[in-house]
Swiss-Prot record:
Homodimer. Nonspherical monomer. mRNA-discriminating component of initiation complexes. Residues 1-370, 453-527 are annotated as: Disordered. It is found in: Nucleus. Residues 203-232 have a biased composition (Gly residues). The lineage of its organism: Eukaryota, Viridiplantae, Streptophyta, Embryophyta, Tracheophyta. PANTHER family: EUKARYOTIC TRANSLATION INITIATION FACTOR 4B, EUKARYOTIC TRANSLATION INITIATION FACTOR 4B1. This is Eukaryotic translation initiation factor 4B1.
Length: 527
């Protein structure tokens, strides 16, 4: 019966061996055991033996023998009994029955794989050289049983081999060893070799020294000594050189053969000298700036005020601030709680004052101020720009108002040419023209708003007709015309109502895809 931990295919080999033994036993039966000499008649029965023996025989008296006679009695008295010779090895008949070759196997057995033996059989070995013996040994190891099955304790069978003295050269010449360094030695620091000296000229003397191979190495007494290879070696006696003292005992060498370490005495100090405090030592250190001094100290020695000089430099180099523009700056404000007043107060006390804030816009002025200086009305310009953004035809009311305004302007020129600019008739005509222009602006804004609100995405085509007439919305015109003034004294123009509400679709033509014709017809119906 094959063992459960046997090799691969062991059960098949055992079964074949049993079949061969059974066939051999059937072909050659075992011979009958030889009969005893004389047959059964040579052994008397119990009764005959008792009668033949007669009565109880008298016991013979023993004979006294010496030790020497006792040892030689058996050899001299009777010849030694020769043990029957046992046949060694197999008989000629058994030798003839042994198989002369492998058993012939059927095709099924040949096709059937036996474990890992057939794995990689069709591959050809690659490479060559020193690695061939390894591959052959590896192939032969496949037939052998596993090491895990042979031994229960692997550490017991581990063999210890001491490391050779010249292991470094052996490794370089013969290639890598089969075992690792962890298997060869238990203490790695025992065979660790010292590194060569960084400055070989500062050793005990001149000469040559080799770390691991042959060469020359000088001893402490002079001459050459071989460390591990060939070379010359001189006794560590005194040297004949003039620089060495004759009869001097050489200094003891360390285990590694390096020069001895120098043990120097501490430096001697004068006991009468007083110790220097640490503060003075720190002061005595050279300054990285040399004899340079701070700028403030240099100016103070010259009798100059560095604060005034900085103020003059700032005035020359700083850009013009917002004081030149029409808008007031918080840094230059005269209010008591403003930052500018605080800065001026600090500067008056003599403390270092903060630098004035520079206007990032420089001399730039607001748009409204620039237009007023040019004699243009920025309100009309803004209304004109807003009106251009609305795509609608000019209404009849707007046309009539524009014609009346143009006629009044012509009359005003004639009156000014006849009566002069300061006449009352000219003032009345100019006031009437300004009123009609305001009325025209209100009408334009109202019609533009209807178009903008009519183009909202959620509104229909007839939403514009639902707005009340213009006469019932005087507050809308006030919201657009009477605008609050800014803090700097310049009027600013707020955003239109539709922009404040977030409706920007009317700025672009056809942005919401609404029909323009339907909106125009609905607005005309509302007029």
């Amino acid at each position: 019966m094959a063992k459960p931990w046997g090799g691969v295919g062991a059960w098949a080999l055992d079964a074949e061996r049993e079949d061969e033994e059974r066939e051999h036993a059937a072909a050659f039966p075992a011979p009958d055991p030889p009969a005893a000499a004389g047959g059964a008649a040579s052994f008397p029965s119990l009764k005959e033996a008792v009668v033949a023996g007669g009565g109880k025989q008298k016991k013979k008296k023993g004979t006294t023998l010496s030790l020497s006679e006792f040892t030689t009695y058996g050899a001299a008295g009777a010849p030694r009994r020769v043990a029957p010779a046992e046949p060694k090895g197999l008989t000629p008949q058994e030798m003839m029955m042994l198989p002369t070759g492998p058993r012939e196997r059927s095709e099924d057995e040949l096709d059937r794989s036996r474990g890992f033996r057939s794995y990689g059989g069709d591959r050809e070995p690659r490479g060559g050289g020193f690695d061939d013996d390894r591959r052959s040994s590896r192939d032969s190891d496949l037939d052998m049983p596993s090491r895990a099955d042979e031994s229960d304790n692997w550490g017991k069978n581990k063999s210890f081999s001491p490391a050779p003295t010249d292991s470094g050269r052996r490794d370089r010449l013969s290639g890598p060893s089969p075992l690792g360094r962890s298997d060869d030695i238990d203490n790695w620091s025992r065979d660790k070799k010292p590194l060569p000296s960084r400055y070989p000229s500062l050793g005990t003397g001149g000469g040559f020294r080799e770390s691991s191979g042959g060469g020359f190495r000088e001893s402490s007494g002079g001459g050459f000594r071989e460390s591990s290879g060939g070379g010359f070696r001189d006794s560590p006696g005194p040297s004949d050189s003039d620089r060495w003292v004759r009869g001097a005992v050489p200094a003891p060498m360390t285990n590694n053969g390096d020069r001895p370490r120098l043990n120097l005495n501490p430096p001697k100090r004068d006991p009468s000298a007083t110790p220097v405090p640490a503060a003075e030592v720190a002061r005595s250190r050279p300054s990285p700036f040399g004899a340079a001094k701070p700028r403030e100290e240099v100016l103070a020695e010259k009798g100059l005020d560095w604060r005034k000089m900085e103020g003059e430099i700032e005035k020359k180099t700083s850009r013009p601030t917002s004081s030149h523009s029409s808008r007031p700056n918080s840094a230059h404000s005269s209010r008591p709680g403003s930052p500018g007043s605080q800065v001026s107060a600090v500067g008056s006390e003599g403390a270092p004052r903060a630098r004035p804030k520079v206007n990032p816009f420089g001399d730039a002025k607001p748009r409204e101020v620039v237009l007023q200086e040019k004699g243009k009305d920025w309100r009309k310009i803004d209304l004109e720009l807003e009106h251009r953004a609305v795509n609608r035809p000019e209404s009849e009311e707007e046309k009539n108002l524009k014609e009346e305004i143009n006629l009044l302007k012509v009359d005003l020129k004639e009156i000014e040419a006849i009566a002069g600019d300061g006449s009352e008739q000219a003032k009345e005509v100019s006031e009437k023209i300004s009123q009609m222009e305001k009325q025209l602006d209100l009408l334009t804004v109202e019609l533009d708003d209807k178009i903008r609100f009519g183009q909202r995405p959620s509104s229909g085509a007839g939403r514009a007709a639902a707005f009340p007439p213009a006469s019932e919305e005087p507050h809308v015109a006030v919201a657009h015309m009477d605008r609050p003034r800014s803090r700097g004294g310049v009027e600013t123009y707020p955003k239109p109502v539709e922009e404040r509400w977030g409706f920007h679709g009317s700025r672009e033509r056809g942005s919401f895809g609404g029909g323009g014709s339907s909106d125009r017809s609905s607005t005309r119906q509302g007029w």
